[in-house]
Amino acid sequence: MSEALSLFSLFASSFLSATLLPGNSEVVLVAMLLSGISHPWVLVLTATMGNSLGGLTNVILGRFFPLRKTSRWQEKATGWLKRYGAVTLLLSWMPVVGDLLCLLAGWMRISWGPVIFFLCLGKALRYVAVAAATVQGMMWWH
């Protein structure tokens, strides 16, 4: 598989992982790190961009579609967002809860600047941690 196609696959997987659809972006990232198809920072940046754009898509959807309070998680996430604001989006990488946080950030009309900054930072830190653990593991085994 060419490097460009591999990077597109990682981007698409990361984008889908930021929605409620399964994307398994961490598995794809680790596989690409192990294959050595591209520099680790290129892979981390690609995964971060895809996942961040997916998260921002959820924020946009939250702005357009009204949400009804129906679940305990939604009430808890709304409380976090009211208390801590956009900083809560550092947790946007978490499965299901992160998707809900992004939707609620849009629904609550939190300012774009802080939303973009904290959402991207949270997602980047996750991929940096996965890549660092993988690279360290590779060095340990060799």
UniProtKB/Swiss-Prot annotation:
Keyword Transmembrane among UniProt keywords: yes
Annotated membrane topology: Multi-pass membrane protein
Any single biological process term in GO: bacterial-type flagellum-dependent swarming motility
GO cellular component: plasma membrane
Subcellular locations according to the entry: Cell inner membrane
Chain ranges on the Cytoplasmic side, renumbered to this chain: 1-2, 48-86
Chain ranges on the Periplasmic side, renumbered to this chain: 24-26, 108-142
Segments crossing the lipid bilayer: 3-23, 27-47, 87-107
Keyword Cell membrane: yes
Keywords from the UniProt entry: Cell inner membrane, Cell membrane, Membrane, Transmembrane, Transmembrane helix
Disulfide-linked positions: none
InterPro entries, A to Z: DedA_domain, VTT_dom
Protein family (similarity comment): To H.influenzae HI_0489.
Protein name: Inner membrane protein YqaA
Gene: yqaA
